[in-house]
Amino acid sequence: LPTYWEKVRPLLEGSPVKVSSIGFYCNALENEGQRKTLEHFIDNAHLFGTDVVTTFAGALEGQPVEKAIPRYKEVFGELARRAEAKGVRLAIENCPMDGTWHKATCNIGFNPKAWEMMFDAVPSRAIGLEWEPAHQMVQLIDPLPQLEEWADRVYHIHGKDATLHWDRVRKWGVFGAGEFAESRTPGYGDTDWRDVFHILYSRGYVGDLVVEGFHDPIFKEEREWAGQLHALEYLKWCRGGTEESPW
């Protein structure tokens, strides 16, 4: 990372752009090398001017979420102490990575029931969430009440939305016979991001919201940057822009 920072630094000098977080998404519960790399990220986040390292909670792959909690407590207890010493916060992305509660893949931190277990096992405030509505919507979870409840543990936010096709749910169900959810660029999905900002403001959120692209089924390839630029302007307006809304 120090070598990489020397490449990044000239690109940022004289620019208003800052690094909101650095991320290493891994399974530190089962992979010792990945755990060491995550420690390296914690130790070097300060080089990039950020105190947020984003990651996964790990898992015992193929096993239920609750089976991983003792190992999570062991590994992330140590990582939390390291982060506290460095003034760093770990933000666990709320992405299932195609796993389920009964058969997790590389991240148990995708569901609020798991968050309760994780934060009970390791209460340190050095561990929180990297949150977005899309990963909750694909679980048929209403994201806004969830954000209201968990806002004080949200340390970083991805600007990514989803569209739920309820007609497909009614026709095919949710066990994979047909796709019922699509990731969308903010401004094209089901979420009114004014509501997201209202919750963040009311709960005193201090942090960043970054557009996550390369998922939208329409705004991809040659349309990718058009979609991301639209998302940026849309989110700035939802945040409280001064121009009249075109939407």
Which sequence ranges carry the predicted segments?
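Active-site-proximal beta-strand/loop segments in catalytic clefts of secreted hydrolases
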Residues: F24, E93-C95, K160
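Residue-level signal for short, function-critical loop segments
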Residues: Y25, A59, P133
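Conserved beta-strand positions in the central sheet of alpha/beta enzyme cores
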Residues: S21, T54, A91, Y155-H158, ...
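A short, structure-level motif marking secondary-structure boundaries and short turns
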Residues: Y25-A28, Q63-V65, F180-S183, P217
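Active-site acidic/histidine proton-transfer and metal-coordination neighborhood
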Residues: W5-E6, L11-G14, K18, A28-G128, ...
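Aromatic- and glycine-enriched glycan-recognition loops and surfaces
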Residues: L1-E6, T191-W193
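Histidine-acidic metal/acid-base catalytic patches
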Residues: G49, G77, H102, G109-W247
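N-terminal small/glycine-rich loop or linker at the start of catalytic domains
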Residues: K18-C26, F175-A177
